[in-house]
Amino acid sequence: MNKWDERFMQLAETVAGWSSCFQENRHVGAVIVKDKRILTTGYNGASSGIESCAERGECLRRVRNIASGTMQEVCYAVHAEQNAIIQAAKLGVSLEGATMYVTHQPCVICTRMIINSGVKRVVYKNGYPDEFALQLFAQSDVELIKYSDLK
């Protein structure tokens, strides 16, 4: 593992702390870099102008008894990976050939966006139980690496 991998993962963890998700285990951060330069960052939180679960004092998914990994559309939050990709689009920044550092393995929805965004390498720290996302990464030309496996 090189110092840049460490620095960018530390930054992803810092960005995760900005999350407005009510559930602390859902505080996720993402940093997209290319040539050792930060292109964008993202954390999971409500869309611009929408009151977050943290501000509401409750998690919509918990209130409705929605199981983790299901019905992801029933949530105020936009995922960290999605927010990082959206910021690049808003700013006109190409992600072609970039690396994404993310605190958690991307879900299948984020995986599809990452594959189409031009990002070529994803380094994640914590696992997430989404086998289909892993299958999609395996079929794509995007390299998925667990942070602890970096040497």
What are these regions (language model features)?
Residues 1-151:
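Zinc-dependent deaminase catalytic domain
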